[in-house]
Amino acid sequence: YADYALFIGTSLYGVIEAKKYGQDISTNLDQSKRYALNIVPQDGADILGDWNGYKVPFLYSTNGREYLQQIATKSGVWYLDVRQKYNNSRSIKGFHSPEDLQKKFEQDIALANKKLEENSLDFLQLKTGLSLRDYQIRAIQAVENVIIHHPDLNRALLAMATGTGKTRTIIGLAYRLIQTNRFKRILFLVDRTLLAKQALDGFKDYKVDDLKSFSDIYHIDGLKTTWPDIDSRIHFATVQSMVKRLYYNDVEDKALSIDAYDCIIVDEAHRGYLLDKEMDDEEMEFKNQDDYVSKYRQVLDYFDAFAVGLTATPALHTTEIFNKPVFNYGLREAVLDGYLVDQDPPIRITTQLSEEGIVWEKGEKPTVYDKEGNQIVELEELEDELKFDVSGFNKRVI
């Protein structure tokens, strides 16, 4: 007998193989598959279909332990949609809600993939629309190829030089993914409010199809929206706000389900800090680059969603999350194609200040700015030499 059966009304949607805490989980869900093969309907229970002998579409296996990559076979909720032979089991953050399971069952992925593969992209190059260039079309096709032909991969990275039109490219991609119903809702994730506003303006202003913008055709939720509307097709949010909603939310009945978004777009996926860079208030919410990567990875791991990363400069931590870029269009190629202008070699100007820094000798009395009193005050005599190098200028020296 199955450990748990998931019914919505009288219809059987899933079975769960429950293991003891810490016990090995069969990541290929062998036991759940046996349950699904040997199900016998009775007492008015409805079987939704038969898929290669399996009489239930969604299978789960878990031991109650939160997923840890280091002990993959001993943690997490493992899930498999048996309706397509090419589907592989994967670890997810939790169980799908009844509403999510119904939507998953109603969604025809095979048909959506067929539309995505067969529908022409020519309209994206029209002057009355996005007017995309050839390399932008190739970028879209590269991501779509992963979605259609590599269902075992759930992430893709686009590397495109600054100034080559990443925003227009992603608008074209998002439109096709929504138009074909391949995904029902996209989360557009950024680390700064300004980036979100710039991208949102693009979705509102750029014409996509039939002289209409994305926002003219589909409903968009902006940064002020905490919980996406039921008819929302794309939702803009910062990493900071999303982490708070997912992991520091006290309102249990408003917790986002793992299927609230089935596609996530991460803008500026490389994300890094410079030692002498002044951080704004939003950036200060992250301790450092590692803290930022950790947090946006938490968001990616929470949702059962395909993720697309956008970057101009793929860093090691970026490829560790998204794998190697599925499409590259660098500065040199853009210059040769005539879309960007090459830069001259940098001229480095050195000064005594930048070379030697600022030094106060022992016995001197340095001055500091008193924020509370809004005045310059003199300190006591220094007991030892005090030196600031270039990296400390922006943060500690006026």
Label each residue range with its predicted role.
Residues 319-398:
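Interdomain helical connector at the RecA1-RecA2 junction of SF1/SF2 helicase-like NTPases
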Residues 161-162, 270-271, 288-318, 338:
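Conserved helicase ATPase motor motifs in RecA-like P-loop NTPase domains
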Residues 60-61, 235-238, 265, 305-311:
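Structural recognition of the conserved hydrophobic beta-strand(s) that form the central parallel beta-sheet
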Residues 39, 48-50, 57, 217-218, ...:
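Phosphate/diphosphate-binding loops
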Residues 1-164, 168-185, 190, 194, ...:
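ATP-dependent helicase/translocase motor core
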Residues 234-295:
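Conserved RecA-like ASCE ATPase "motif II neighborhood" in helicase/translocase motors
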Residues 13, 21-23, 65-68, 193-195, ...:
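Conserved nucleotide-binding/hydrolysis micro-motifs of P-loop NTPases
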Residues 207-248:
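Inter-Walker segment of RecA-like/P-loop motor cores
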